[in-house]
Amino acid sequence: MKTKRHSLPGQVVLVLQGGGALGAYQAGVFEALSNAGIEPDWVIGTSIGAINGALIAGNTPSQRVPRLREFWQGLGSASIGGNWATVFRGIPSFFRPRPAAWTVPLAPIGLDEASYYSTEPLKRSLESLIDLETLAQAKMRLTVGAVAVRSGALKYFDSRDVPLRIDHVLASAALPPAFPAVRIDGEPYWDGGVYSNTPIEAVFDDNPRRSSIIFAVNVWQASGAEPNSIWEVMGRQKDVQYASRDDTHIARQKQLHQLRHVIRELARQLPASKRDSTGCRELATYGCGTTMHIVRLLAPSLASEDLFKDIDFSSSGIRDRWNAGVRDALQMIERAPWNDPVDPLEGVIVHELSTRTGMEVRET
């Protein structure tokens, strides 16, 4: 039974990486949050993270988990035959092969058709599962990342600023060369994961910045064992690439945010006569007193997975990842590390589960 809404110290942000079938873990995390009465104020996603985010933000509270489950069960029930069957046949509710792209790859067919698969099935699925009116109302804020094909610049489409449509979600999930670019106002976009697969910086760049509990749900393994075969090398390369230097991003944001806290404190120590001068007031605007708790949740490696794990849409794979998301999120919710006292000058506190012990680790 769902409990009453939690009262957390700050806005609740859910940050979702891209990762194809690995996104089932994210759905499990959200189910645990929902059942605990923790409702995100803001969801930020890339690729499958954008799809999950739209299914959450684009439905009323009572429909969010059911819509997620309907989407993921539809993928799993259609994946009989293993990963190679997915490559050659596609998934009826997600993508279907374009035969010409496989047989005549040099044909000048245009950017809108230049992909191995069509995502028209995904578009129809999302249209049936997302309430566009609810999405446009932006009661739960949604931000999705995509890359402009021509400039290579990363762009965040934010429901706070513009009404989001299904095409914005498809653009964020348009991973080349598998999926075609999607045009927004005439400009073609690809999957935001091409540029940055972990869009956590959007929280720190927000204006105005707010104290936040950030559930950062990562589905790729930044660290791993030494590979022993070409197959394992390919899998490890994919993990490193799509983990998207998450540790580095967070370390940089911690340094910047601590400097903001120091600036704020220094400004407060100035005599009133200096503090009120135009120059000091301008410098003080670079200060900030917000506190960011980053709760990192990392999808586990399944015993059977290989370099094709991101297209493992088997019912068992989806079930195991979903259940792992529920389990890990519940453990963090029960621990509630964001309630622990913090140094007022420490603006960013990272909490994560140890992959060795399963216990919560606090990193300041």
Language-model region placement:
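Small-residue-rich anion-binding loops in enzyme active sites
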Residues: 1-12, 140, 147-150
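Patatin-like phospholipase
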Residues: 2, 8-15, 20-116, 120, ...
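Short internal beta-strands
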Residues: 43-44, 216-218
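Short secondary-structure transition/capping segments
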Residues: 53-55, 146-147, 346
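Short alpha-helical "patches" and their helix-cap loops
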Residues: 66-75, 185, 341-346
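Exposed alpha-helical structural elements
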Residues: 67, 121, 125, 134, ...
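Active-site-adjacent alpha/beta core region of enzyme catalytic domains
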Residues: 85-217, 224-225, 280-300, 305-306, ...
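Terminal low-complexity/disordered tails
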Residues: 219, 225-287, 321-326, 336-364
